Amino acid sequence: MNLHITKSKNAESFYICKSYTKANGSTTSAIVRKLGTLEQLLPEHGPTRDDVLAWAKNEVKIETEKYKKEKEAQTVLIPFHADRQLDYNKQVFFRGGYLFLQSFYYQLQMNKTCRKLKQKYKFKYDINAILSDLIYAKILEPCSKRSSYKVASEFLEKPSYELHDVYRALDVLGTECDLIQAEVYKNSHFLGKRNDKILYYDCSNYYFEIEQEDGNKKYGKSKEHRPNPIIQMGLFMDGDGIPLAFSLFPRNANEQISLKPLEKKVLEDFGCQKFIYCSDAGLGSESIREYNHMGERAYIVTQSIKKLKKDEKEWALNPQGFKRVSDDAPVDITKISEDDKGLYYKDEPYTTKKLHQRLIITYSPKYALYQKSIRDKQIERAQKMLDSGNTKKNRKNPNDPARFIGTLAVTKEGEAADVKHYLDENKISEEGQYDGFYAVCTDLLDDEVDDILKVSEGRWQIEECFRIMKTDFSARPIYLQDENRIKAHFLICFLALTIYRFLEKKLGSKYTCEKLLDTLKGMNFAEIQEQGFTPLYKREAITDDLHDVCGFRTDYQFITKSKMRNIQKKSKGKE
């Protein structure tokens, strides 16, 4: 509603008008109520014109509130005809799950970051719409960039760009990858304080659907033993499981060299100066520990017991000297039952040439039983291989059951050797001695063991980050060739993961990844005779929670077009 004033030769008239959109998309207005002329209104609402104007504006406000209440309470009657066919090429299905992701996209002020890019490069296409749609599609329907454009065309808000603009935008996004990461981190504080006093780091590889290595895409060993060229991604994550920063490097390069350039970026561009670095043993070399011992930084890294010196290994595996983590009570771990749920530890100073450290050994009967059960199954498979004569020549995988098969060459003088295979009991016994044991090394000499172990246990979240990107967001295989566009691909995956993690955190981590993603994918709408929309999803506790954390609701039996536009505005932080 708005106040409309007309002036003629004889009078000044005041009207309350309502604007609306016609079927062809044009806007017009209609008079809702005539308030009267200035001459008529002055005696009751004067004595001045300003007094009349103030009264008239208040009447508009009252009329607007009245209209809204009537609109919300009204019953909508829309005629359908059983003998009328559907219109050609008329879209009636619309995806709406992106609205909840959009709420976090705009809270991260990524639209403002895109505005900076537009001012810098002077392009005409809408990079904010392109980036946001690519992120939403990555979460809701992971597919190629071309297919993502088709997915976006099913959103309630249509793409305001063409497909060729998407590929142009990828070049810019790849070039400005570091800037965007820094901006997202800075703006993420609008969503609450970041737990950036603990930073986890890990690497994972991604393969390409190409035959020849090129640039950063190098041949290398992957867990799946694929022959395709591979690139590695290094990822920093905060203590709440939310991504912080990433970098890319060739697979044939040592993953340890990936850390320092990215950590330097975190130190300088993000302003994170005081934190505990946490990683697995593969990314916890002596040089990495020294690097994270500088300034206000510290480290907690896993330590391979097998790689300890002889006397340190003997101390670690000795059952004496352990204490219960919960109360520090001394315990002889040889006397506790297999089904004991407790965790036990011992620690000692662990000094190298340059570092004064602390080595913490833990023992878990539950973990020991788990490791033994896994190995027993592998031994069974090894025995079956021996019985069938199907033994492997190459046993490079540390989890391959064939590692338990020994080879013995028996020969008589002057004759060729007979090769015999057998179950290697010594190998089995050697592995068994490590069951249940785990080691952590840190330069936090005075902190409580329980606190140190809790930080180390949080590493599962960064492993889950990679799993979500690879499995749920289909970050691999990669079909792009250009280096900048490859960077943009990973940037989109990174941003999708960041938004997903913030949403997950806001929901209190109540729901599994599968449940949350399935719910978002299912929150769709059907357009009814161009009058509005009806939800196509089932209302549940999770949909109520999504609406509560995002500050709008879509779970009405019918949503008028004007109300849906208001919902879209709210999802962008506009009232």
Which residues are covered by each model-predicted region?
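Conserved nucleotidyltransferase catalytic core and NTase-mimicking acidic/glycine-rich helix/loop elements
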Residues: 496-497, 502-530
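Short amphipathic alpha-helical "interface-anchor" segments enriched in bulky aromatics
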Residues: 452-479
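An anionic, glycine-rich sequence signature occurring as long contiguous blocks
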Residues: 231, 245-248, 296-455, 518-575
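Basic, amphipathic alpha-helical segments enriched in Lys/Arg and hydrophobic/aromatic residues
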Residues: 36, 482-503
